[in-house]
Every structure is written in structure tokens, then in C-alpha cells.
Amino acid sequence: MTFRDLLSVTFEGPRPDISAGGSGAGGGAGAGAGAGDTASSESPAVGGVPGAAGGGGGGSVVGAGSGEDNRSSAGEPGGAGGGGEVNGTAAVGGLVVSAQSVGVGVFLAAFILTAVAGNLLVILSVACNRHLQTVTNYFIVNLAVADLLLSATVLPFSATMEVLGFWAFGRAFCDVWAAVDVLCCTASILSLCTISVDRYVGVRHSLKYPAIMTERKAAAILALLWAVALVVSMGPLLGWKEPVPPDERFCGITEEVGYAVFSSLCSFYLPMAVIVVMYCRVYVVARSTTRSLEAGVKRERGKASEVVLRIHCRGAASGADGAPGTRGAKGHTFRSSLSVRLLKFSREKKAAKTLAIVVGVFVLCWFPFFFVLPLGSLFPQLKPSEGVFKVIFWLGYFNSCVNPLIYPCSSREFKRAFLRLLRCQCRRRRRRRPLWRVYGHHWRASAGGGPHPDCALSAGAALPGAALALTAAPAPSSAAAPEGQAAGAGRRKPPCAFREWRLLGPLRRPTTQLRAKVSSLSHKIRAGGAQRAEAACALRSEVEAVALSVARDVAEDNTCQAYELADYRNLRETDI
């Protein structure tokens, strides 16, 4: 059963002055069927849908069609007599609308409103929450923008055409509407393709991801994405389409063979191939990396210390060159932190799982349409019936409605952001620098002393209001140290303490999850024993920089990458 079968609409003829309605004198009803049978009708048939007219003063006429035009049939409604109600239809203004058409209209209106509201929530969630403003979420916002444009500018006219049974907005606007439809759908699909590539980079290079995928690169990628979508959608506007039908009440996507194949390849099959390859790679990398990290954590558990936190103080004891205050850090000794790497990788893998669900739903929604469209253009005898095609076509539209519903079900961050928006708790704070920022150079592990002390946090020392006790980090083993420096590898630097400063800063209304992450982090960044240091390292006002050092790879000659804690007094849960 199609949308056309669910509704019946007909224009009324000149309404005579009748005192008695219903089936009174002169009243009667005629019916026109889409198969070609007519009853006392002189209305022409358009798109395979003949008109029907009924005589008398109180009758109403139902005209239904079952054309094979695949996007929309343009049946011309028959004429009807004056007021009254027959077989569940009622006169509303100049139209006689059935109860089924009202139900279909209400359903489609709810469908469109859900899509608009859901995509608006995604956009506003990222705009109102600084911790959600990441490159990956920018791609998600672009996906929501494409779906929002589709829901707000295309779907209302598609729904109107389904309810009325014909296109009522003119030939010129039909061409524009079809082009915007292709533009938004192509941009949505290409956004999912971009997201899959972004997730592969995030999982494959989780520590170097901020340096690889910058905001400037993301903006260039999005500009290219919309340019490709625009090129695909401009074909019919430039004449790459079938001959224009004479009746302006017919409007549908072009079935010209060349354009159907071209648009299907560019809008679906090539992006889908990239998506499938990227997520297969994500699965392989995630499985191998998880195993190696778990094995590394087991090995590290048996070691006494690992340096994670680096605090550089002004005016501290200098190295051999006696140059205090230098920001350089070559020659500092520290171990790798597999625990931090595992934490960061697990977050990337979780985001990849969420977006894999989005991509799976996308394939289920769009594959039937992009399979049927070129097939019907190449082999007209294989065209599906109108009812089957309409279900397939609106299934593609359904993808724009379901994407915003996936995020709160699989992402607690988006769920909390949605709830805050629904409670009108959008509080945009001033822009700050990212909490973790990549240095422009690498730090090489060695046993030599540096211009600043190398401090690490003692376990259990990050208590609110308490002085922060720090102990010096031991040098790495002789096997990890450069050749010729094994003698100094076993020496420990003098202990240092850092007082009157809170590592995690003042937290406003911390959630249970945030407290758990804070507790976990305070135990992960530790070195040596829990003994408290005696000498003061610096006061809070003397802090120059706080950095997190993470090993990249043993095969890279123990080169390490440092992440700077730019604003340590405002720590967010997603920054841990």
C-alpha cells in the first residue's frame, strides 16, 4: 500500500446553494480508480492517474492513482460536487480530504519535526559545551547541518507532495528543490565518510592526533566536501536530465541514465567503499593496539615508578650549564606512561564504536535507494512498484531523523549535553586554550641533568587544600639510557616539594564520574615511594609550565612527546 493509496484528495467544483446535503435529491458520488477506469469523467489523465468527477450537490469524489514515475506521481484530481461527507472524506476549504490523508500528514509532520529538533540539539550541544568542541565533533556538527537543511528545506515539500498527490509549487521551484535534495543528501553521506577517516586517524595515531588533524585542516576538508556535493547536485540544473514533462504538477528526480549512475557513484558507492575500508582498519588497529597496551600495562605494573607529570619551576637549580629559566627540556629523564596512553586510546576507540553505529544505520537506510535508482534507469522493466519505491525513498530520509537519536544512546557526553539544553542550562564560557597542547619538539630520554628539576607527583598527595608533595623521578635503566650514560642512570635527583598549589584546581559541582576520573588520575601519575619531600620546589606563583610526558615508541630511540597542561586550574572531565 502506498501513500497515494492511503489518501484521497479532490478539488470541489462550483459549490451550489443546497439546503439539504448528504445523499439528498440530486446527490451522488462518483469514483475514479488509478487503473484507468472512469465514471462519468471528462478530466484528463496525468501520469497514469485519470481524474474522476461526480455529479450532484452533496457527493464527493475520490481520485487515486498508481503511476510508475518512481519519485512522485502527478495525478490530476477530479472535480467534486458541493459539501457533504461520503466514505470518510470531508470538505476542508477547497479540498475534500480523507481521514487517511490527515493521518499521513500528521505522521510526516511529526517525522520532520523530530529530524529538525534532533539535529538542532546536536548543533547546540557542541556550541554550548566547550569540552565537546573537538575536530571529530565538528565533523558531526557538519553532518547535523546537512541533515537539518534536508529536514527544513526539502522534507516539507516532499511531505506536501505525498499528501496532495501532485506537485503544487511550479516547475522552476521543482528543479531547485530536487537540486537541494541531492546537495543535502550527498553532503550528509560525505560527512559520514569524513568521520570514518577521522576516526581511523584518531585510533591509529591517538597521541599524535591533535597535531595531525587541526582545526584548519578540518575546515579545508569540510569546504572540499560541500564543493563536491554542489558539483553532484548541479547536473540537472545545467541540463543533464530527462525531457521536462508538460504537466507542471509532476516533479521528481531525473532518471537520465548517465546522471543516475554518476550521482550514485559519487554520492554513495565511493563514500561507502571508503567508509567500509576505514572501519575495517579501525577494527584491526584497535584489536592489535588494545592487546599491546594491555601487555604493556602488565609489564609496567611490576616497575616501581613511572614519571607522568613534569613541573618546570622558575629559578630552580640549573644544570651543568648553569642557565636558569630556560624552557628547553633536553636531557630530562623520565619513563613512559602506558596508563595515560591506554586511557587516551580507549576514548578514541569508544568514539569509533559510536560512529560505527551511525555508519551502519546509514548503509541500511541509503543502500536500497541507490541500488534501485541506477537499476531502474538502466533496466526500466526492473523498476519496482510505486509503493515499494516510496518506502525505499523515505527510508533514506529516515536516516536524517535517526542520526541525532544515536548519540545520546551511545555517548554519555552528548546525553548530558542534550539534557542540559532541554533544561535550558546552556552556559557558554569564555574561550580557553585547549587543555592539552602538543609541543613543537620531542624530548629525548637521557641521564643528564636539565635546567629545571624533574618532578613527579607522589601517590595520594593531590588532596584539596593540602600541600602538593613531589618526589624526584629515578633515571631509566641502563638498557634504555643512551650509550655512555649508564653510570648516571641510577642516580636520583634531590627530592623536591611543591606547596600551596592544588593539582586539580577548584572543581565546581564535580560529578561522580569526574571524581572517579580524578581519583584514578591521581594514582596513575606517581613516581617512587610515597615519602614526602622536604625541600620546597616552588610556590604556585612560580610555576612556569606543567607537562605530561608520554613515550611514543621504543623503536624510535626512546623519543617522547610532551603535552602541556595549559590551564591546570580548570580541569574538565573529558580532558583527563
UniProtKB/Swiss-Prot annotation:
Extracellular side: 1-101, 165-174, 244-256, 379-385
Topology in the lipid bilayer: Multi-pass membrane protein
Transmembrane segments: 102-126, 139-164, 175-197, 219-243, 257-280, 354-378, 386-410
Positions in the Cytoplasmic compartment: 127-138, 198-218, 281-353, 411-576
Keyword Transmembrane helix among record annotations: yes
Primary location group: membrane
Cellular component annotations (GO), alphabetically ordered: plasma membrane
Composition bias type Gly residues, residue spans: 21-35, 48-66
SUPFAM superfamilies recorded: Family A G protein-coupled receptor-like
Chain segments carrying region Disordered: 1-82
UniProt record similarity statement: Belongs to the G-protein coupled receptor 1 family. Adrenergic receptor subfamily. ADRA1D sub-subfamily.
Self-association state and partner proteins as the record states: Interacts with FLNA (via filamin repeat 21); increases PKA-mediated phosphorylation of FLNA.
Protein name according to UniProt: Alpha-1D adrenergic receptor
Source organism per UniProt: Oryctolagus cuniculus
Lineage of the organism: Eukaryota, Metazoa, Chordata, Craniata, Vertebrata
Gene designation: ADRA1D
